[in-house]
């Protein structure tokens, strides 16, 4: 028996309660699925770093904007990507799995990974400027974001062999490798000397 979703896909994941989202995630109908959860976890990580940025030096800047503004924007972007992932999965399960849908099933996790990469960079800057007990919250946010990043790359790499466009696959794989190096560096910089 297929259990109906508590809320239709037209209701954004940003508007669902945590409990509703988790119930939907555990239910039989797909979506939401792993990619949607990955984007939501990335948004949670961004939120923790954003909260700490509010306590840190207001001058913490990343790429010409405040870390807090960048983190807020990426939090919102990740929630939009959660919705995009749910739509892609819905289309794939509905049997509309053509080349364009398969590319979207790669493009959405790539966008999640890119957003998580931005969170990692901004969160790392926040850790450098924050002090006191709130630093631990930013580091926890980075651990969550790193998990979401790695899950997004796993999804991307799992889906990559499904596309026929070799240049798309090669360019996407290269971008993923570059992101991985950048995120690893930012994470290590932020967590240097942190147990865990």
Language model regions located:
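Acidic, polar-rich N-terminal leader regions of halophilic archaeal proteins
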Residues: 1-196
